[in-house]
Amino acid sequence: MQSPTSKEKLQSLLRWIGLGMLCCLTLIGKAEGDWRDNTKLLVYSPRYFGANAFPTPEMYGGRLPARWAAELRGDFHRMTGDKTKDIYASLYIPIAQGKAGVKVQGVIREFYKTSEAVRDERHAVETKPVIPCYGDVVINCHYQVLRSEKWADITVSANLKTASGGRLCDARFTDAVNYWFDTNVGRTLWQTPEASIRLQGLIGFYCWMTNDLIHRQNDALCYGLGLTGQWKSLTLSSTWNGIHGYEKNGDRPMALRFRAEYELLKNALAFQYKKGLKDDLYQAYSISYIRYF
């Protein structure tokens, strides 16, 4: 029997290489197809997305801050089958001595680890990020409508969440915008030179785009109630707020929040605990550093 020549060996090697490349391309194409197929199955609602996908309207107690404020915060979110950590930053810019204000905020980086059960329920691809996951940029524009010690303090706002967040395939951030308009009302119930107690409420309209070919957007009511107490440099607050969508597909999250902030020489530390209710499945712990100017 004659041994294979060098030319025959080379041809055989090239055939095996070609076969291997074909198998790799087939697997890659299948993976890409699976990823794109899964996005059609995603449910664009707070229940079936990550902890930061649907920002909640903020409560200012009817009074806009008169100072610049820069905040850096770390959040730790927990639910059954999902552990999420993130780094958040914001900048509040007062306008016309506090009669208006603009806030720019967002999640700089998100880290997450989900179970396979949560991944499958959300129709996600991965259980943890294979590339860095960045959050959405949110822009809030506020205006002080009324400021009255006798009656009440009232602010209105227009807000936009951009579609800049990543990892849609893992159901972390949507590829669509959210926008909302709300009214904040607050009134001081009791006050001394060093302490005060205020009642606050929020009502508004919240809307986000979806991937549903029939219902292209979900229109919702946003609401909230809260109580804030202040003594010298210490501020304690508790709020209850949420969103009430009309599709009933996990679009009705609520949350209780308890926050403590202590300020010293324009530097403040804040701690917050959030208990998610109904379609908000997360508990969250936060620690913030705020610098006032």
Which sequence ranges carry the predicted segments?
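Transmembrane beta-barrel outer-membrane domains
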Residues: 80-84, 130-136, 172-178, 194, ...
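Transmembrane beta-barrel domains of Gram-negative outer membranes and organellar outer membranes
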Residues: 31-162, 177-184, 234-239, 256, ...
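Detector for outer-membrane/organellar transmembrane beta-barrel domains
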Residues: 174-245
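Outer membrane beta-barrel transmembrane domains
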Residues: 115-117, 121-127, 214-215, 221-293
